[in-house]
């Protein structure tokens, strides 16, 4: 059973923390009186501070990019600490050290829980910008990320085009589709249906784990593909805790149990709502015209088997943004291919970095 202390223990000992006592006003006007940002750094800044790479993580990720993208780090790899200063921060609203629903609310002394405000991808990027400014960084060579991370990459290009030299967005769209919003809402409803949910005001020692596990099981079905699951599991059976199970059932139960050991339900709700709010055109004009206004070089990575963010969405981005190019990851693993085909993704990022030299 996950509790808040257990979540704190999941923050790696290499994690650094930035604290800001300057109030943060969210896009929709809520005030966070103070911020804590958990982040990791690899490598060192060069003399003119021009070698910074910013990595943006996905929904249940953390600042530990060398863990979840391990094959991307090392000598000769895309994220080479001997060449670059690489920074990854835990997003606003998460539960791995950055201010979010599991953080103490200064007004009450208790954790925010359900009182944590609605946030957006833009809020996440603005917090990252505050961190980088505090670190004395004025220029970023590349902002790169996938899924929720890819959404952050796009917002970096619109919010701070003078700071980022180039962008690389993987498995993401310029705005969340009805299909994705529906997936998110179904997962949230699974959490809400848990008897321990209590409107989000659940006891830390008794969280809605059944609901969160069910949400994860649903999500895992959208992160992969028909071809991948059919090839990997088919209709094979195996013995499980509840007797004979299809192998796919056992796998999904395992994934659900794993997530509740490392994540928080309010955090899941907060971040999926932020993803649903994703729309680079909100408040900026017509969608197509906003994309045409993007001036930065951007490489868009499309995964051919991704059922969440299909190729048509990345092709639209590449067609409308004037300095965009598109790459295709032709693999059967679905949306999660960016985490599975790391060697190929590493080569793509490396090639793009070489073009920027």
UniProtKB/Swiss-Prot annotation:
GO CC annotation terms, alphabetical: cytoplasm
Binding sites annotated in the UniProt record for substrate: 216, 336
Matches recorded under PANTHER family: HOMOSERINE O-ACETYLTRANSFERASE
Domain AB hydrolase-1 residues, every copy: 51-340
This protein's name: Homoserine O-acetyltransferase
A UniProt-annotated Pfam family: Abhydrolase_1
EC number of the protein: 2.3.1.31
Signal peptide, first to last residue: none
Source organism of the structure: Chlorobium chlorochromatii (strain CaD3)
Free-text function comment from the UniProt entry: Transfers an acetyl group from acetyl-CoA to L-homoserine, forming acetyl-L-homoserine.
Subunit structure: Homodimer.
Record-annotated active site: 147, 306, 335
Molecular function per GO: homoserine O-acetyltransferase activity
Main location: cytoplasm
One GO BP annotation of this record: methionine biosynthetic process
Gene from which the chain derives: metXA
Family (UniProt): Belongs to the AB hydrolase superfamily. MetX family.
Keyword set, alphabetical order: Acyltransferase, Amino-acid biosynthesis, Cytoplasm, Methionine biosynthesis, Transferase
Pathways per UniProt: Amino-acid biosynthesis; L-methionine biosynthesis via de novo pathway; O-acetyl-L-homoserine from L-homoserine: step 1/1
Keyword S-adenosyl-L-methionine recorded: no
Cellular compartment(s): Cytoplasm
Catalytic reaction(s) noted: L-homoserine + acetyl-CoA = O-acetyl-L-homoserine + CoA
